[in-house]
Protein backbone atom coordinates (compact mmCIF):
# COMPACT_ATOMS: atom_id res chain seq x y z
CA UNK A 1 0.00 0.00 0.00
CA UNK A 2 1.21 3.48 -0.80
CA UNK A 3 2.53 5.66 2.01
CA UNK A 4 -0.43 7.39 3.63
CA UNK A 5 -0.35 11.14 4.22
CA UNK A 6 -2.67 14.12 3.99
CA UNK A 7 -1.53 15.12 0.52
CA UNK A 8 -2.46 13.50 -2.80
CA UNK A 9 0.28 11.52 -4.51
CA UNK A 10 -1.23 11.95 -7.98
CA UNK A 11 -3.21 14.70 -9.72
CA UNK A 12 -5.80 13.50 -12.25
CA UNK A 13 -7.10 16.22 -14.57
CA UNK A 14 -10.56 15.38 -15.90
CA UNK A 15 -13.38 13.30 -14.40
CA UNK A 16 -14.56 11.61 -17.58
CA UNK A 17 -14.32 7.87 -18.19
CA UNK A 18 -10.51 7.80 -18.39
CA UNK A 19 -9.99 10.11 -15.42
CA UNK A 20 -12.42 8.22 -13.21
CA UNK A 21 -10.94 4.84 -14.16
CA UNK A 22 -7.41 6.11 -13.53
CA UNK A 23 -8.50 7.49 -10.17
CA UNK A 24 -10.10 4.20 -9.16
CA UNK A 25 -7.01 2.18 -10.07
CA UNK A 26 -4.96 4.52 -7.87
CA UNK A 27 -7.21 4.61 -4.82
CA UNK A 28 -7.78 0.85 -4.83
CA UNK A 29 -4.02 0.57 -4.33
CA UNK A 30 -4.00 3.07 -1.48
CA UNK A 31 -2.77 6.05 -3.50
CA UNK A 32 -4.33 9.43 -2.70
CA UNK A 33 -5.62 11.46 -5.66
CA UNK A 34 -6.47 15.08 -6.36
CA UNK A 35 -9.19 14.92 -9.03
CA UNK A 36 -9.89 18.09 -11.02
CA UNK A 37 -12.99 18.64 -13.15
CA UNK A 38 -13.87 22.00 -14.70
CA UNK A 39 -17.57 21.36 -15.37
CA UNK A 40 -19.95 23.06 -14.69
CA UNK A 41 -17.76 26.12 -14.01
CA UNK A 42 -16.36 25.87 -17.53
CA UNK A 43 -18.88 24.29 -19.95
CA UNK A 44 -17.86 22.21 -22.96
CA UNK A 45 -20.77 22.87 -25.31
CA UNK A 46 -21.63 19.16 -25.47
CA UNK A 47 -22.05 18.03 -21.86
CA UNK A 48 -25.42 18.68 -20.27
CA UNK A 49 -24.73 17.95 -16.58
CA UNK A 50 -22.14 18.42 -13.86
CA UNK A 51 -21.82 14.67 -13.37
CA UNK A 52 -18.62 12.65 -13.75
CA UNK A 53 -18.29 10.21 -16.67
CA UNK A 54 -21.21 11.72 -18.58
CA UNK A 55 -21.83 9.75 -21.79
CA UNK A 56 -22.36 12.40 -24.45
CA UNK A 57 -22.49 10.79 -27.90
CA UNK A 58 -24.45 7.60 -27.17
CA UNK A 59 -25.44 5.39 -24.25
CA UNK A 60 -23.93 2.31 -25.90
CA UNK A 61 -20.55 1.11 -24.65
CA UNK A 62 -20.20 -1.22 -27.65
CA UNK A 63 -20.57 -4.91 -28.37
CA UNK A 64 -20.62 -7.37 -25.52
CA UNK A 65 -19.90 -10.41 -27.69
CA UNK A 66 -16.60 -12.18 -26.86
CA UNK A 67 -15.75 -12.58 -30.56
CA UNK A 68 -15.97 -8.83 -31.22
CA UNK A 69 -13.10 -6.42 -30.68
CA UNK A 70 -15.06 -4.33 -28.19
CA UNK A 71 -16.16 -7.46 -26.33
CA UNK A 72 -12.58 -8.74 -26.12
CA UNK A 73 -11.40 -5.38 -24.78
CA UNK A 74 -14.14 -5.42 -22.13
CA UNK A 75 -13.04 -8.92 -21.11
CA UNK A 76 -9.47 -7.68 -20.64
CA UNK A 77 -10.50 -4.59 -18.68
CA UNK A 78 -12.80 -6.55 -16.38
CA UNK A 79 -9.89 -8.90 -15.66
CA UNK A 80 -8.06 -5.78 -14.45
CA UNK A 81 -11.02 -4.77 -12.24
CA UNK A 82 -12.35 -1.88 -14.33
CA UNK A 83 -14.59 0.30 -12.17
CA UNK A 84 -16.29 1.96 -15.15
CA UNK A 85 -17.35 -1.38 -16.62
CA UNK A 86 -18.56 -2.65 -13.24
CA UNK A 87 -20.88 0.36 -12.95
CA UNK A 88 -21.91 0.03 -16.60
CA UNK A 89 -23.08 -3.54 -16.05
CA UNK A 90 -24.89 -2.46 -12.87
CA UNK A 91 -26.94 0.09 -14.83
CA UNK A 92 -27.28 -1.89 -18.04
CA UNK A 93 -30.41 -1.45 -20.18
CA UNK A 94 -31.64 -3.90 -22.85
CA UNK A 95 -29.71 -3.48 -26.11
CA UNK A 96 -29.30 -6.92 -27.64
CA UNK A 97 -25.63 -7.88 -27.81
CA UNK A 98 -24.47 -4.37 -26.97
CA UNK A 99 -23.73 -2.98 -23.52
CA UNK A 100 -25.92 0.11 -23.16
CA UNK A 101 -26.53 1.97 -19.90
CA UNK A 102 -28.92 4.34 -18.20
CA UNK A 103 -26.52 7.23 -18.61
CA UNK A 104 -27.88 9.42 -15.80
CA UNK A 105 -27.95 6.63 -13.19
CA UNK A 106 -24.50 5.52 -14.36
CA UNK A 107 -22.99 9.00 -14.01
CA UNK A 108 -24.70 9.73 -10.68
CA UNK A 109 -23.36 6.53 -9.12
CA UNK A 110 -19.82 7.34 -10.26
CA UNK A 111 -20.01 10.95 -9.06
CA UNK A 112 -21.33 9.88 -5.64
CA UNK A 113 -18.58 7.29 -5.19
CA UNK A 114 -15.70 9.49 -6.31
CA UNK A 115 -16.68 12.62 -4.37
CA UNK A 116 -17.30 10.58 -1.23
CA UNK A 117 -14.10 8.54 -1.20
CA UNK A 118 -11.60 9.32 1.56
CA UNK A 119 -8.64 9.01 -0.82
CA UNK A 120 -10.04 11.49 -3.37
CA UNK A 121 -9.69 15.26 -3.00
CA UNK A 122 -12.12 16.69 -5.55
CA UNK A 123 -11.51 20.17 -6.96
CA UNK A 124 -14.13 21.76 -9.20
CA UNK A 125 -11.92 24.05 -11.26
CA UNK A 126 -10.29 24.37 -14.67
CA UNK A 127 -6.70 23.24 -15.02
CA UNK A 128 -4.80 25.38 -17.50
CA UNK A 129 -1.40 23.74 -16.97
CA UNK A 130 0.16 20.85 -15.07
CA UNK A 131 1.13 21.34 -11.41
CA UNK A 132 4.84 21.89 -10.85
CA UNK A 133 5.29 18.82 -8.66
CA UNK A 134 3.96 15.31 -8.42
CA UNK A 135 2.62 12.71 -10.81
CA UNK A 136 -0.02 14.01 -13.24
CA UNK A 137 -2.52 12.13 -15.40
CA UNK A 138 -4.06 14.20 -18.19
CA UNK A 139 -7.53 12.84 -18.97
CA UNK A 140 -9.33 15.96 -20.16
CA UNK A 141 -10.91 14.20 -23.11
CA UNK A 142 -11.79 15.41 -26.59
CA UNK A 143 -13.46 18.54 -25.19
CA UNK A 144 -10.32 19.82 -23.48
CA UNK A 145 -10.58 23.54 -22.75
CA UNK A 146 -8.89 25.95 -25.17
CA UNK A 147 -6.54 27.24 -22.45
CA UNK A 148 -5.32 23.76 -21.58
CA UNK A 149 -4.96 22.90 -25.28
CA UNK A 150 -2.85 26.01 -25.79
CA UNK A 151 -0.57 24.99 -22.91
CA UNK A 152 -0.31 21.42 -24.20
CA UNK A 153 0.56 22.59 -27.70
CA UNK A 154 3.22 24.92 -26.36
CA UNK A 155 4.62 22.36 -23.90
CA UNK A 156 4.83 19.36 -26.22
CA UNK A 157 5.85 21.32 -29.29
CA UNK A 158 3.37 19.41 -31.42
CA UNK A 159 0.25 20.87 -32.97
CA UNK A 160 -3.01 19.46 -31.76
CA UNK A 161 -5.15 17.63 -34.26
CA UNK A 162 -8.92 17.90 -34.39
CA UNK A 163 -11.95 16.16 -35.77
CA UNK A 164 -15.65 16.85 -35.49
CA UNK A 165 -18.04 14.62 -33.61
CA UNK A 166 -21.82 14.54 -33.49
CA UNK A 167 -24.58 13.60 -31.05
CA UNK A 168 -27.81 11.72 -31.82
CA UNK A 169 -31.31 12.84 -30.70
CA UNK A 170 -33.25 11.29 -27.80
CA UNK A 171 -37.06 10.99 -27.74
CA UNK A 172 -39.80 9.72 -25.45
CA UNK A 173 -40.92 6.12 -25.88
CA UNK A 174 -44.60 7.02 -25.51
CA UNK A 175 -44.41 9.33 -28.52
CA UNK A 176 -43.44 6.47 -30.87
CA UNK A 177 -46.35 5.22 -33.00
CA UNK A 178 -46.09 1.49 -32.37
CA UNK A 179 -48.65 0.75 -35.10
CA UNK A 180 -45.85 1.81 -37.46
CA UNK A 181 -43.01 0.08 -35.57
CA UNK A 182 -42.06 -3.30 -34.15
CA UNK A 183 -39.77 -4.60 -31.41
CA UNK A 184 -36.99 -7.00 -32.46
CA UNK A 185 -33.26 -7.59 -32.58
CA UNK A 186 -31.49 -7.92 -35.91
CA UNK A 187 -31.55 -11.60 -36.98
CA UNK A 188 -33.57 -12.28 -33.82
CA UNK A 189 -35.85 -15.28 -33.41
CA UNK A 190 -39.54 -14.54 -33.98
CA UNK A 191 -40.25 -15.92 -30.50
CA UNK A 192 -37.55 -13.77 -28.89
CA UNK A 193 -38.44 -10.49 -27.17
CA UNK A 194 -36.32 -7.88 -28.88
CA UNK A 195 -34.52 -4.91 -27.34
CA UNK A 196 -34.82 -2.38 -30.17
CA UNK A 197 -37.82 -0.48 -31.50
CA UNK A 198 -37.59 -0.69 -35.29
CA UNK A 199 -39.22 1.90 -37.52
CA UNK A 200 -39.62 0.49 -41.06
CA UNK A 201 -39.89 2.57 -44.22
CA UNK A 202 -40.92 1.66 -47.75
CA UNK A 203 -39.01 2.86 -50.80
CA UNK A 204 -41.08 6.00 -51.36
CA UNK A 205 -40.87 7.00 -47.69
CA UNK A 206 -37.13 6.40 -47.63
CA UNK A 207 -36.45 8.40 -50.78
CA UNK A 208 -38.52 11.35 -49.55
CA UNK A 209 -36.70 11.20 -46.22
CA UNK A 210 -33.29 11.28 -47.91
CA UNK A 211 -34.37 14.16 -50.18
CA UNK A 212 -35.54 16.24 -47.22
CA UNK A 213 -32.52 15.30 -45.13
CA UNK A 214 -30.11 16.53 -47.80
CA UNK A 215 -32.10 19.73 -48.30
CA UNK A 216 -32.35 20.53 -44.59
CA UNK A 217 -30.48 23.50 -43.13
CA UNK A 218 -27.41 22.74 -41.06
CA UNK A 219 -25.89 24.67 -38.19
CA UNK A 220 -23.09 26.87 -39.49
CA UNK A 221 -19.73 25.96 -37.95
CA UNK A 222 -17.03 28.58 -38.63
CA UNK A 223 -14.35 26.00 -37.75
CA UNK A 224 -15.76 23.44 -40.18
CA UNK A 225 -13.20 23.85 -42.97
CA UNK A 226 -13.89 22.88 -46.56
CA UNK A 227 -12.04 19.59 -46.11
CA UNK A 228 -13.73 18.85 -42.79
CA UNK A 229 -15.23 15.57 -44.04
CA UNK A 230 -11.75 14.12 -43.63
CA UNK A 231 -11.92 15.13 -39.95
CA UNK A 232 -15.23 13.41 -39.22
CA UNK A 233 -14.66 10.24 -37.24
CA UNK A 234 -16.37 7.43 -39.15
CA UNK A 235 -18.07 6.00 -36.07
CA UNK A 236 -19.96 9.24 -35.42
CA UNK A 237 -20.59 10.55 -38.94
CA UNK A 238 -23.64 12.85 -39.07
CA UNK A 239 -26.53 11.12 -40.79
CA UNK A 240 -26.70 13.91 -43.39
CA UNK A 241 -23.03 13.35 -44.27
CA UNK A 242 -23.66 9.64 -44.81
CA UNK A 243 -26.67 10.45 -47.01
CA UNK A 244 -24.61 12.84 -49.12
CA UNK A 245 -22.35 9.99 -50.24
CA UNK A 246 -25.14 8.24 -52.18
CA UNK A 247 -28.90 7.70 -52.22
CA UNK A 248 -28.59 4.19 -50.77
CA UNK A 249 -25.77 4.98 -48.32
CA UNK A 250 -28.12 5.05 -45.33
CA UNK A 251 -29.67 1.71 -46.36
CA UNK A 252 -26.20 0.18 -46.13
CA UNK A 253 -25.42 2.08 -42.94
CA UNK A 254 -27.54 3.02 -39.92
CA UNK A 255 -30.82 2.27 -41.75
CA UNK A 256 -29.88 -1.15 -43.11
CA UNK A 257 -32.91 -3.50 -43.15
CA UNK A 258 -31.09 -6.86 -43.28
CA UNK A 259 -32.07 -9.25 -40.52
CA UNK A 260 -35.57 -7.82 -40.09
CA UNK A 261 -39.05 -8.83 -41.20
CA UNK A 262 -41.82 -6.25 -40.94
CA UNK A 263 -44.66 -8.09 -39.14
CA UNK A 264 -47.20 -5.93 -40.97
CA UNK A 265 -46.10 -7.14 -44.41
CA UNK A 266 -44.17 -10.33 -43.71
CA UNK A 267 -41.32 -8.94 -45.85
CA UNK A 268 -38.02 -7.19 -45.29
CA UNK A 269 -38.51 -3.39 -45.16
CA UNK A 270 -36.77 -1.09 -47.63
CA UNK A 271 -35.06 0.67 -44.71
CA UNK A 272 -35.23 0.58 -40.90
CA UNK A 273 -34.54 3.23 -38.28
CA UNK A 274 -33.61 1.68 -34.92
CA UNK A 275 -34.36 3.14 -31.49
CA UNK A 276 -32.27 2.00 -28.52
CA UNK A 277 -33.36 2.28 -24.88
CA UNK A 278 -31.63 5.22 -23.19
CA UNK A 279 -32.63 4.81 -19.52
CA UNK A 280 -33.55 2.03 -17.09
CA UNK A 281 -37.22 3.06 -17.00
CA UNK A 282 -37.47 2.57 -20.75
CA UNK A 283 -39.11 5.98 -21.10
CA UNK A 284 -36.39 7.41 -23.35
CA UNK A 285 -34.88 6.07 -26.58
CA UNK A 286 -32.10 7.36 -28.82
CA UNK A 287 -32.06 7.07 -32.61
CA UNK A 288 -29.22 4.68 -33.41
CA UNK A 289 -26.62 6.11 -35.77
CA UNK A 290 -28.50 9.40 -36.23
CA UNK A 291 -25.83 11.83 -35.07
CA UNK A 292 -26.57 15.11 -36.79
CA UNK A 293 -25.73 18.78 -37.21
CA UNK A 294 -29.07 19.90 -38.64
CA UNK A 295 -30.71 22.97 -37.15
CA UNK A 296 -33.00 21.92 -34.33
CA UNK A 297 -36.22 22.83 -36.12
CA UNK A 298 -35.05 20.91 -39.17
CA UNK A 299 -34.28 17.83 -37.09
CA UNK A 300 -37.83 17.73 -35.77
CA UNK A 301 -39.29 18.29 -39.24
CA UNK A 302 -37.15 15.72 -41.07
CA UNK A 303 -37.07 12.98 -38.43
CA UNK A 304 -40.85 13.14 -38.10
CA UNK A 305 -41.01 12.01 -41.73
CA UNK A 306 -40.18 8.55 -40.36
CA UNK A 307 -43.72 7.09 -40.10
CA UNK A 308 -43.34 5.76 -36.55
CA UNK A 309 -41.89 9.10 -35.40
CA UNK A 310 -44.52 11.39 -36.91
CA UNK A 311 -45.50 12.55 -33.40
CA UNK A 312 -42.07 12.17 -31.78
CA UNK A 313 -41.35 14.24 -28.68
CA UNK A 314 -37.63 14.97 -28.54
CA UNK A 315 -35.98 15.44 -25.15
CA UNK A 316 -32.57 16.15 -26.67
CA UNK A 317 -31.72 17.13 -30.21
CA UNK A 318 -28.50 16.32 -32.03
CA UNK A 319 -25.52 18.60 -32.33
CA UNK A 320 -21.97 18.63 -33.62
CA UNK A 321 -18.93 19.64 -31.60
CA UNK A 322 -15.21 19.77 -32.10
CA UNK A 323 -13.17 16.97 -30.54
CA UNK A 324 -9.47 17.60 -30.03
CA UNK A 325 -6.67 15.11 -29.53
CA UNK A 326 -2.90 15.10 -29.44
CA UNK A 327 -0.38 13.54 -31.79
CA UNK A 328 0.65 11.18 -29.00
CA UNK A 329 3.21 9.07 -30.93
CA UNK A 330 5.52 12.08 -30.84
CA UNK A 331 5.81 12.14 -27.06
CA UNK A 332 4.15 9.12 -25.39
CA UNK A 333 5.78 5.83 -24.40
CA UNK A 334 3.84 2.52 -24.36
CA UNK A 335 3.39 2.98 -20.59
CA UNK A 336 1.43 6.18 -21.46
CA UNK A 337 4.17 8.29 -19.87
CA UNK A 338 5.57 11.40 -21.53
CA UNK A 339 9.03 10.56 -22.89
CA UNK A 340 11.04 13.27 -21.14
CA UNK A 341 8.66 13.58 -18.15
CA UNK A 342 7.97 10.10 -16.74
CA UNK A 343 5.87 11.68 -13.98
CA UNK A 344 3.34 12.81 -16.61
CA UNK A 345 0.74 10.50 -18.16
CA UNK A 346 -1.82 11.05 -20.93
CA UNK A 347 -4.96 8.91 -21.10
CA UNK A 348 -8.36 8.67 -22.75
CA UNK A 349 -9.58 10.06 -26.04
CA UNK A 350 -7.13 12.95 -26.01
CA UNK A 351 -4.29 10.45 -26.62
CA UNK A 352 -5.86 9.15 -29.83
CA UNK A 353 -8.38 6.41 -29.07
CA UNK A 354 -12.07 6.61 -29.93
CA UNK A 355 -14.84 5.03 -27.93
CA UNK A 356 -16.01 4.72 -24.35
CA UNK A 357 -14.38 1.35 -23.64
CA UNK A 358 -11.16 2.38 -25.36
CA UNK A 359 -10.95 5.59 -23.29
CA UNK A 360 -11.61 3.59 -20.14
CA UNK A 361 -8.78 1.23 -21.06
CA UNK A 362 -6.28 4.05 -21.46
CA UNK A 363 -7.34 5.49 -18.12
CA UNK A 364 -6.96 2.09 -16.47
CA UNK A 365 -3.42 1.62 -17.76
CA UNK A 366 -2.37 5.17 -16.83
CA UNK A 367 -3.80 4.75 -13.33
CA UNK A 368 -2.20 1.33 -12.91
CA UNK A 369 1.22 2.60 -13.97
CA UNK A 370 1.00 5.79 -11.91
CA UNK A 371 0.16 3.63 -8.89
CA UNK A 372 3.09 1.32 -9.60
CA UNK A 373 5.46 4.29 -9.64
CA UNK A 374 4.06 5.44 -6.28
CA UNK A 375 4.61 1.91 -4.97
CA UNK A 376 8.20 1.87 -6.30
CA UNK A 377 7.37 -0.71 -8.97
CA UNK A 378 8.20 -0.48 -12.69
CA UNK A 379 5.40 0.54 -15.07
CA UNK A 380 4.01 -2.17 -17.36
CA UNK A 381 2.97 -2.49 -21.00
CA UNK A 382 0.16 -4.87 -22.01
CA UNK A 383 1.16 -7.35 -24.73
CA UNK A 384 0.52 -6.20 -28.33
CA UNK A 385 -1.33 -9.47 -29.00
CA UNK A 386 -4.07 -8.24 -26.61
CA UNK A 387 -6.66 -5.65 -27.59
CA UNK A 388 -5.57 -3.21 -24.88
CA UNK A 389 -1.94 -3.65 -25.88
CA UNK A 390 -2.78 -3.18 -29.55
CA UNK A 391 -4.50 0.14 -28.81
CA UNK A 392 -1.52 1.28 -26.75
CA UNK A 393 0.81 0.33 -29.58
CA UNK A 394 -1.32 2.33 -32.03
CA UNK A 395 -1.26 5.56 -30.02
CA UNK A 396 2.47 5.31 -29.31
CA UNK A 397 3.79 3.96 -32.64
CA UNK A 398 6.58 6.28 -33.77
CA UNK A 399 6.05 5.43 -37.44
CA UNK A 400 2.82 7.45 -37.61
CA UNK A 401 2.81 10.64 -39.66
CA UNK A 402 0.96 13.62 -38.19
CA UNK A 403 -1.62 13.94 -40.96
CA UNK A 404 -2.26 10.19 -41.05
CA UNK A 405 -2.87 9.78 -37.31
CA UNK A 406 -6.55 9.71 -36.36
CA UNK A 407 -8.60 8.34 -33.43
CA UNK A 408 -8.88 4.57 -33.39
CA UNK A 409 -11.50 2.15 -32.08
CA UNK A 410 -10.68 -1.37 -30.93
CA UNK A 411 -10.56 -3.64 -33.98
CA UNK A 412 -8.96 -6.93 -34.95
CA UNK A 413 -6.83 -5.25 -37.59
CA UNK A 414 -4.70 -3.84 -34.76
CA UNK A 415 -3.75 -7.22 -33.34
CA UNK A 416 -0.32 -8.74 -33.91
CA UNK A 417 1.17 -12.13 -33.17
CA UNK A 418 -1.11 -14.34 -35.25
CA UNK A 419 0.31 -16.64 -37.89
CA UNK A 420 -0.20 -15.91 -41.56
CA UNK A 421 -3.52 -17.30 -42.83
CA UNK A 422 -3.35 -20.47 -44.85
CA UNK A 423 -4.77 -20.49 -48.35
CA UNK A 424 -8.54 -20.62 -48.17
CA UNK A 425 -8.63 -19.84 -44.46
CA UNK A 426 -11.70 -17.83 -43.47
CA UNK A 427 -11.75 -14.45 -41.74
CA UNK A 428 -13.67 -16.09 -38.89
CA UNK A 429 -10.95 -18.66 -38.25
CA UNK A 430 -8.23 -15.98 -38.34
CA UNK A 431 -10.23 -13.92 -35.86
CA UNK A 432 -10.71 -16.95 -33.62
CA UNK A 433 -6.96 -17.58 -33.65
CA UNK A 434 -6.27 -13.94 -32.80
CA UNK A 435 -8.68 -14.11 -29.85
CA UNK A 436 -7.02 -17.26 -28.50
CA UNK A 437 -3.59 -15.62 -28.74
CA UNK A 438 -4.89 -12.39 -27.17
CA UNK A 439 -6.31 -14.27 -24.19
CA UNK A 440 -3.14 -16.31 -23.73
CA UNK A 441 -0.92 -13.24 -23.81
CA UNK A 442 -3.16 -11.20 -21.52
CA UNK A 443 -3.44 -14.01 -18.96
CA UNK A 444 0.36 -14.16 -18.81
CA UNK A 445 0.50 -10.36 -18.46
CA UNK A 446 -1.89 -10.36 -15.49
CA UNK A 447 0.05 -13.17 -13.82
CA UNK A 448 3.15 -10.96 -13.77
CA UNK A 449 1.44 -7.96 -12.15
Residue ranges and their predicted role:
Residues 4-18:
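Beta1/beta-strand and adjacent pyrophosphate-binding region of the FAD-binding site
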Residues 54-65, 89-105:
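Dinucleotide-binding Rossmann-like beta1-alpha1 core, especially the glycine-rich loop
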Residues 358-373:
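An active-site-proximal "capping" alpha-helix that borders the catalytic cofactor pocket
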Residues 40, 350, 369-449:
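Glycine- and aromatic-enriched mobile tails/lids
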Residues 103-122:
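Helical element adjacent to the flavin cofactor pocket in flavoenzyme catalytic cores
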Residues 287-353, 360-362, 378-397, 402-409, ...:
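A glycine-rich dinucleotide-binding beta-alpha-beta segment and adjacent secondary-structure elements
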Residues 116-276, 281, 285-296, 300-301:
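Predominantly flavin-linked oxidoreductase catalytic cores and closely associated redox partners
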Residues 24-85, 384-395:
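N-terminal FAD cofactor-binding segment of flavoenzymes
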Amino acid sequence: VARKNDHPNVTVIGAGLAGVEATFQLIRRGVRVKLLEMRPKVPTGAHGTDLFAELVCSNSVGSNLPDRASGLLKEELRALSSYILDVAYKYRVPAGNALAVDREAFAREITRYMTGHSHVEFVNDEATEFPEEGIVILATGPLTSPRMLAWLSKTFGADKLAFFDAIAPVLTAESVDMTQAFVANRYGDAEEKGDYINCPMNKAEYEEFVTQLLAAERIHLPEFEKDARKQLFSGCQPVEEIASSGKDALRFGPMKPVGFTDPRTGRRPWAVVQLRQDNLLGSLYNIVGFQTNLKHGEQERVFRLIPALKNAVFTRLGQMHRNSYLFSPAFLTPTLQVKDRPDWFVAGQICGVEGYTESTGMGLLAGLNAARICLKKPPVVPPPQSMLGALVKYVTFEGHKVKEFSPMNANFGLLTGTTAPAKGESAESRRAAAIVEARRAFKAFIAEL
